[in-house]
């Protein structure tokens, strides 16, 4: 809109249906995506959002027996959860230590990449920081496995 960028990702199953294992991994990533959106508000830093994301992803992978310790999350999650959006897709230098302010737009992009199972899942939304928290600008795009499978079945 008016020259500003967006950065949105969804992971769709090529067959139209997620396998049980793909759903399991997808749901972990979705929990991280939702946790970041819930936590994003003025004063919170990108570092805090990234730490939260890694915690949720590690808890999920530990619960399904994929990792034994949160220290292993780097094997399957090797990027940050957020960056600023603006006139460029990756707007301005990443300053993980600056508190967010109302009016900023950031990405929310957790992902898990499990090479040995040939599974890669990323869910990316754009968040507008508001005085009260944030507004998910990409809310209308199907996000859950059920919504995506229904869309693909049309």
Regions flagged by a language model, labelled:
Residues 1-154:
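Active-site neighborhoods and metal-handling regions in enzymes and metal-associated proteins
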């Amino acid at each position: 809109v008016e020259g500003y960028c967006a950065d949105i990702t969804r992971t769709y199953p090529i067959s139209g249906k997620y396998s049980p294992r793909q759903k399991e991994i997808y749901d972990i990533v979705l929990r991280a995506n939702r946790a970041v959106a819930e936590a994003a508000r003025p004063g919170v830093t990108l570092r805090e959002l990234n730490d939260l994301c890694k915690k949720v992803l590690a808890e999920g992978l530990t619960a399904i027996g994929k990792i034994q310790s949160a220290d292993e999350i780097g094997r399957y999650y090797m990027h940050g959860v957020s960056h600023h959006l603006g006139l460029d897709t990756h707007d301005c230098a990443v300053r993980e230590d600056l508190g967010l302010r109302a009016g900023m737009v950031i990405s929310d992009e957790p992902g898990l990449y499990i090479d040995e199972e040939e599974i890669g899942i990323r869910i990316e939304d754009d968040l507008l920081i508001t005085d009260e928290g944030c507004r998910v600008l990409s809310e209308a795009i199907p996000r859950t496995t059920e919504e995506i499978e229904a869309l693909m079945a049309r």
